[in-house]
A protein has these predicted regions:
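N-terminal regions that are enriched for targeting/export leaders
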Residues: 1-84, 161-168
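Non-transmembrane, aqueous-exposed alpha-helical and coiled segments at domain scale
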Residues: 52-78, 106-109, 311-363
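An acidic- and aromatic-residue-enriched active-site/binding cleft used to recognize and process polar
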Residues: 81-84, 115-121, 239-244
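Histidine-anchored nucleotide/phosphate-binding helix
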Residues: 92-107
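Short secondary-structure boundary/capping segments
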Residues: 93-96, 127-136, 253-257
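Glycine-rich phosphate/pyrophosphate-binding loops
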Residues: 103-124, 363
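Internal, well-ordered alpha/beta segment that forms a basic, Gly-enriched binding/recognition surface
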Residues: 116-220, 226, 235
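Aromatic-residue-lined binding/catalytic grooves and analogous aromatic/hydrophobic interfacial grooves
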Residues: 181, 185-326, 336-340, 345-346, ...
């Protein structure tokens, strides 16, 4: 085992177990062993497929959106490993190509490859949603960062930030030309990136989208069509928080739905908070994660919310990036309004609850 793999195994027990069981296999052999692990459908799985189809239709049309839903219906597996951002970062590209390969091993054509991605990272996340990553370069860290968004917006959340504007693209291209003149990247790479910016980022398809969240869906579909010389698949990215918010609204309309029981019945809610305390993707007491939902403020900054109960009423409370106290009543109406106006974002627990536990999709 290489030094890097040894360090990986030491820091990540799950990776160590994976290497122990499958370290001697080829990628194709390993991919061939992955499959849906059925659970009972507690709520209709077609609800999720309807929301997927409805989300993609305005971007790609009824036929492509329908094929995306059909692929998920047949395979019952959701790729949820990636942050929602224009896919320049190398691990993201590798992961999406592996998912494409897995679907083709299952007998799919690979023309449409669906992804559910997490839109809660900040722009300064290590996958660099703030701009483009260039790997053909002489930078000491092995990649060159070309920002679209100014430094002052580095703490803004991908889910809430405005889209990449033509001025942002022009600024990035000016920086790219400077770096090429310095020899930081090859002229061939600089030419390819400039062509991409003009043909994709400045296209009507991308610029008609008002938010980075929407633009990412279009950009990544156009990017993936350039990955291969013999085929032009569309990798269709949907923010999992968007899908979860729409499913929650469906659930809230049914009084007996388990989601509402978990959120609004005091005894069940208290048991859930205790059981998931310290679990990855959930919360750790009052110090880590968030209780069910994140808050989003007018700076597009994400902040945690904590459940508080007083006089029999429950509310989510927190402090935003401006130092203001925020209180959201834990009611169907307040949560629905917050999800619609963008002041609330679903946490990972609710995202996986809706897709995996309630509607039987392997994630």
């Amino acid at each position: 085992m290489t030094e890097q793999m040894t360090a990986l195994a030491e820091n990540y027990p799950a990776a160590a177990e994976l290497l122990r069981r499958h370290g001697g296999e080829t990628l194709l052999t390993y991919l061939g062993q992955l499959h849906h692990r059925p659970l009972p459908d507690i709520l209709p799985s077609e609800d999720l497929l309807t929301e997927v189809r409805d989300y993609f239709t305005p971007f790609f049309g009824v036929e492509t959106a329908g094929e995306c839903a059909d692929v998920l219906r047949r395979r019952r597996c959701l790729s949820t490993a990636n942050h929602h951002h224009p896919a320049f970062e190398y691990m993201t590209v590798q992961d999406t190509i592996l998912c494409d390969r897995w679907l083709r091993l299952q007998g799919e054509s690979g023309a449409v490859v669906p992804f559910l991605s997490c839109a809660n990272p900040r722009l300064d996340n290590n996958v660099y949603p703030r701009g483009m990553l260039v790997y053909d370069c002489t930078a000491p860290e092995g990649c060159l960062r070309l920002p679209f968004y100014p430094f002052k917006l580095r703490h803004a959340c991908v889910a809430a930030v405005e889209g990449i504007s033509p001025d942002m693209v022009d600024n990035a291209l000016n920086r790219l030309r400077q770096e090429a003149r310095r020899g930081s990247c090859s002229l061939r790479t600089a030419d390819a990136l400039e062509r991409f910016c003009r043909e994709v980022l400045l296209s009507d398809r991308v610029q008609r989208c008002g938010t980075l969240r929407e633009q990412t869906t279009v950009i990544n579909a156009m990017l993936s069509q350039r990955y291969f010389t013999d085929r032009a698949p569309q990798y269709l990215w949907m923010p999992m928080e968007t899908r979860t918010a729409r499913l929650l609204e469906r659930d809230f309309r049914t009084e007996a739905a388990l989601t509402g029981q978990l959120l609004f019945r005091r005894e069940l809610r208290a048991a859930l908070l205790r059981a998931l305390d310290g679990v990855s993707g959930c919360w750790t007491g009052n110090t880590g994660g968030t209780h069910f939902f994140w808050g989003l403020d007018r700076r597009a900054a994400l902040f945690p919310l904590r459940l508080r109960e007083s006089a029999g009423a429950a509310a989510l409370t927190g402090q935003n990036s401006l130092g203001e106290a925020v209180t959201v009543p834990l009611t169907q109406q307040a949560l629905t309004e917050g999800l619609r106006d963008g002041s609330l974002l679903t946490g990972l627990f609710l995202c996986f609850l809706e897709a995996h536990f309630l509607r039987d999709f392997t994630v």
